[in-house]
Structures are given as C-alpha cells and as structure tokens.
A protein has these predicted regions:
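A conserved regulatory-domain signal marking ACT and ACT-like small-molecule sensing domains
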Residues: 1-160
Length: 160
C-alpha cells in the first residue's frame, strides 16, 4: 500500500472517531489591537460571561485587531464595555462548527487540510478557524451551518 493511501486510511479512521457539534446565534465584535485598552477590556468582558450557563467567549487575535466571538444575547452588554473609538465592527448571524478529535491520535499533521479543502470546494466561506488538538473550531455564516454539517458528516462518516 502506498504511503498516500495509508495516510488517507488513517485520516478516515480519525474522522470516524470524531464528533461534530454546532453553535448558532453568535456575534463577532472586532476591536483595535491596543494592548493597554485590551488589558482593561478583557477582564470586564469576562466578568459578564457565565461558563455554567454555556456562554460562548472566544478571543481571536490578529496583527491589527482582536475579535471576540460571543453569544448574540450578550452583544449589547459587551458593547457597553468597549470604548467607541476601539470598536472596528460587529458581525451578526455567525455560526460555529466544533470538531472534537479523539485524543489518542495526538497532533497528526494534515488532519485539518482535507476539512478546509472540502468546505472550500463546496463554496463555504470560512470566517476564522481556531483551536488545536483535540478540538478544532470553524467560524462561518450561520446560514451555512446545516450545509457544513452535512459536508462534514459525509467526509467523516460517509453519510449521504
């Protein structure tokens, strides 16, 4: 068996043992990457989040800006904590796909590429990706959640 085929079979095994979950009704709040302002902003935002209630809070860092991914229901409350001159934009109707890989495989190279490729081939606009083993999150438009989920079900489990 060729090396390529072995890797494909191994990836298939990893995908079959993975779980896919989704989250909808999210909002992105993008702010300027001014570390001094963020130093004050982040603790006050965190104080409004309740992990026990399942509140979503992710920080996505970039070179020029920082994005907060939050539940839409928290949007107004969080915006009050952000100085107007620090706010770049908000994006509503965001969805998230969370892929939970089996930890027994470690951090295998090439595990994410086929997923991104398959979504791209199927015309899915990926806003952001984040995470690392054992979890990989894909941020997309909420309207694409169902289509993405179906694509990943086919890729992972061969379901039609």
């Amino acid at each position: 068996i060729s090396k390529e085929k072995k890797k494909k079979e191994y990836l298939s095994k990893i995908y079959k043992e993975s779980r896919i979950s989704t989250k909808s009704r999210l909002t992105i709040i993008e702010v300027k990457r001014h570390l001094k302002d963020l130093e004050n902003m982040i603790p006050s935002i965190l104080s409004k989040m309740h992990e026990s209630k399942g509140d979503v809070f992710r920080i996505l860092g970039g070179r020029e800006s920082i994005m907060f991914l939050i539940d839409h229901s928290k949007k107004e409350e969080i915006l009050k904590l952000i100085p107007k001159d620090e706010l770049i934009k908000t994006i509503e109707n965001i969805g998230e796909l969370i892929i939970h890989f089996s930890e027994k495989y470690g951090d295998m190279p090439g595990i994410v590429g086929p997923i991104i490729n398959e979504l791209g081939i199927n015309n899915i606009n990926i806003i952001q990706t984040m995470g690392g083993m054992p979890s990989f999150d894909i941020v997309i438009n909420q309207k694409d959640i169902s289509k993405c989920h179906d694509i990943l079900l086919r890729l992972f489990y061969g379901e039609r």
